[in-house]
């Protein structure tokens, strides 16, 4: 009976613990870990956690802009002891990375147009060198550069093969000691 209760609880909570997804309007969201301290905003707005923010976007946003407007209504509390940023895109191709500025004491939300991101602050891309960790600014620049090269070669004429090539370019070998692997 105890095992059955655990399974029931897991089934009930699963919709609220998503990490990536796409809704019926074509809005997709992905969460990526960062190397900075977890954001814990405290401006007096209602507080939302990482996984609930994803659920909010998937349930209520029809565009990337709507997703940004929704997230701006909340103070972010990064869950699981990690910091994160979100990549959101919609059916029109409006892609943005949503970051909580690691150089700002208030950790303001910044929504920056970008066509790809990995595990570093897009806001501080110039401070991130490839093939190394870059303190609070993150890592994975080499994977971002590889994806950007794939996109540049296609000049905006993206096909399924382009997407597959970008995914392969961004892939990394599994590492049991890394949460981002």
Roles of regions detected by a PLM:
Residues 1-16, 20-60, 65, 81-84, ...:
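C-terminal, well-structured catalytic/ligand-binding subdomain of enzymes
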Residues 68:
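Extended, Lys/Arg-enriched charged tracts that mediate electrostatic binding to polyanionic substrates
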Residues 73-78:
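A short structural micro-motif
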């Amino acid at each position: 009976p105890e095992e059955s209760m655990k399974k029931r609880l897991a089934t009930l909570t699963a919709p609220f613990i998503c990490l990536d997804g796409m809704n019926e309007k074509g809005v997709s969201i992905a969460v990526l870990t960062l190397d900075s301290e977890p954001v814990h905003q405290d401006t007096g707005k209602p507080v939302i956690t990482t996984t609930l923010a994803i659920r909010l976007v998937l349930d209520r946003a029809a565009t990337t802009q709507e997703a940004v407007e929704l997230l701006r209504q909340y103070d972010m509390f990064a869950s699981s002891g990690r910091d994160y940023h979100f990549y959101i895109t919609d059916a029109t191709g409006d892609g943005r990375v949503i970051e909580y500025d690691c150089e700002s004491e208030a950790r303001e939300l910044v929504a920056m147009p970008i066509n790809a991101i990995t595990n570093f602050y897009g806001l501080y891309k110039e401070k991130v060198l490839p093939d190394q960790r870059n303190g609070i600014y993150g890592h994975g620049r080499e994977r971002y550069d590889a994806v950007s090269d794939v996109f540049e070669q296609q000049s905006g004429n993206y096909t399924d093969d382009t997407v597959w090539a970008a995914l392969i370019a961004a892939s990394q070998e599994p590492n049991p000691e890394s949460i981002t692997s």
